[in-house]
Swiss-Prot record:
One of its GO terms (biological process) is 'de novo' CTP biosynthetic process. Homotetramer. Its EC number is 6.3.4.2. The active site is at residues 378, 514, 516. Allosterically activated by GTP, when glutamine is the substrate; GTP has no effect on the reaction when ammonia is the substrate. The allosteric effector GTP functions by stabilizing the protein conformation that binds the tetrahedral intermediate(s) formed during glutamine hydrolysis. Inhibited by the product CTP, via allosteric rather than competitive inhibition. The keyword Membrane does not apply. UTP binds at residues 13, 186-191, 222. CTP binds at residues 13, 146-148, 186-191, 222. This is CTP synthase.
Amino acid sequence: MTKYVFVTGGVVSSLGKGIAAASLGAILESRGIKVTHLKLDPYINVDPGTMSPFQHGEVFVTEDGAETDLDLGHYERFTSARMGKRNNFTTGQIYESVIKKERRGEYLGKTVQVIPHITDEIKQYIKRGAEGAEVAIVEIGGTVGDIESLPFLEAIRQMGIEEGRNSTCFIHLTLIPYIPTAGELKTKPTQHSVKELREIGIQPDILLCRADRPVPADERRKIALFCNVMPEAVIECLDANSIYKIPGQLHDQMLDEIVCHKLNILARAADLSVWENLLRALENPKHTVDIAFVGKYVDLTESYKSLIEAVSHAGMHTESKVKIHYIDSEDIERDGCAVLEKMDAVLVPGGFGKRGTEGKIAAIRFARENKVPYLGICLGMQLAVIEFARNVVGLAGAHSTEFERDTPYPVIGLITEWQDRSGKLEKRTEASDLGGTMRLGAQVCHLVENSLAREVYGVADIVERHRHRYEVNNTLLARLEEKGLRVSGRAPGTDLCEMIELPDHPWFVGCQFHPEFTSNPRKGHPLFTAYVKAALARKAAATSA
């Protein structure tokens, strides 16, 4: 029978519940326990797929095509568990499901209410997402005290009773702020946060205290006394310069032991040697490399969370410190590409909308003409095709129909139909809804023999995750190929262009998919590792010249 760890947050948002939950999952997994994760988001959107990156940050895409919260990316990177549609749900999904049941008459004429109907639906979703795991770590989004979170908190309160004391554990992440004028840490916000949680009917078993400096033992004893938890269950979460230090930090304070004792689980000792080896590589780099990250959401780097982590993983596996330079593409439109001259490589990530695209195209042209290693992901590949069409093939005004409906050369256009991995035919038009209508999830890509892509991956067929509704226009592709563009990856059966490269360039690759979603610190990802190696080679050549 599955046991549950519920993770809530208090005082302020963005304390790192996702990292804490993922770290606990990593430690429990190292003890031989099969874990899974769930994220419950209290917003009314059905999913984050149509939300602005400035509002929500990155949208993480799972293998089965769910557009989910970025915390699911942390869960996959920290553990071997694969997330899916059942691992993230929102208030919007819950209400949609309940309303559909009411319309079908499943409630037999009863008055449909938050309690019990909404809370019962939440519990059903939690149990469904936890199937097959020994321990399900369930993170409740938002902050205790938010109106939006109340149905979720009531649902997990009920589960605490229904599942039994030895099958549930409640962890509350809170903030211990340091007040410079007083010269001390303050515990009162934590006391009030726990008080609010207890008023709802939830008594936390463990407190994770986020702080920027060590919490003295007497302060921890005070927190334990006034929050009604055992002193050893007051655990400090200190700021760290790498999220991959957190599993060790929590294990050193016996978090996993306390959780296993609470859930009555007998498990082997934790083995965190993999994490220790990764940290050694991270903290003792032999090389340094500078990468220009040209996008339009660079003021909020959470928008590129998985991509940043994937580049970091490549650094670990090449013994390199990767310095990412975030460059707003609109700045390049205004000031030119001089900022790229000292970079060892250029990366253009995915995105939506016309704003900033000309700056990205200028950066791509700089990388192509100056033989700077280039990696274009999703929109970054599409813009590389547009740049090549304009400046090499001579198709003036070439563009994507996403940005210029009447472009004379629509080298990028809407995908009107394709098959998903199950063989189901998907169709789209310009009139289709925005939400949930993209080509999503894991898709097979066949790599051309003797291509750079084939060399990098080392296999003929790969599976990567997609999130896009526009693709390279095959009707114009032949003219680009005549001038040297090479299509190195295609989707079997549909002929969709998945990867492009330039054979006369040291390292120039574009991919329609998002390889960052499958990178993890233990193995890295071959595409990012090869990209960083190319950047290192360019730097070495420039240094010796």
